[in-house]
Amino acid sequence: GGEPIHFLKKRRPERTRNIVTLCDVSGSMSLYAQVFLAFIAGLMRADQKADAYLFHTRLVRITEALRDRDAMRAIGRMSLMADGFGGGSKIGVCLDRFVSSYARRFVDGRSVVVILSDGYDTDQPQVISKALKKLRKRGCRMIWMNPLKGWRNYAPVTAGMKAALPHLDLFATANTLSDLA
């Protein structure tokens, strides 16, 4: 007997996600790099917890440079950091460096890691795969935004992109401004 009791379920409070961007600035990405950097700069202004990196053959953290309120000084800082801009790409090596250094401090289960790259890499594909597997162990979400994916008849045929796909939560198009929104 008695009256039925209705338990109120408590919902967990929504916690903000930490956004970490890694932007490929190698030669094959030179057409898109400026737009992606503007996108990342806007993200950094909108979210004080966001973190940002450039990569080509090496990885460079650009968070502080993008937060500089003096635009000319920020551009100067970026140009000093981006030595190698428009050159080759070693995505796997750069991702591995990110995982073994910065990810320990800036990536956890509330993080979303956004990689802006076409996937063209001079490393062996297993280097990308191993790095993304290690990053996945940190509990983050991973989004790979590829500007080539918006092309008609695009298929991820590069070895590096194929190696990355199984580790991603989302493989998205990034060839228009609306794709980045």
Give the residues covered by each predicted segment:
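Short acidic, S/G/P-rich loop/turn micro-motifs used as interaction or catalytic elements
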Residues: S28-S30, Y120-Q124, W151
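Cofactor-binding loop segments of dinucleotide-utilizing enzymes, especially the Rossmann-like FAD-
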Residues: F55-T57, D118, P147
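Von Willebrand factor
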Residues: R73-S111, N153-P156
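Short beta-strand-loop
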Residues: L54-M78, T158
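Short hydrophobic beta-strand that contains or immediately precedes a catalytic carboxylate
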Residues: V20-D24
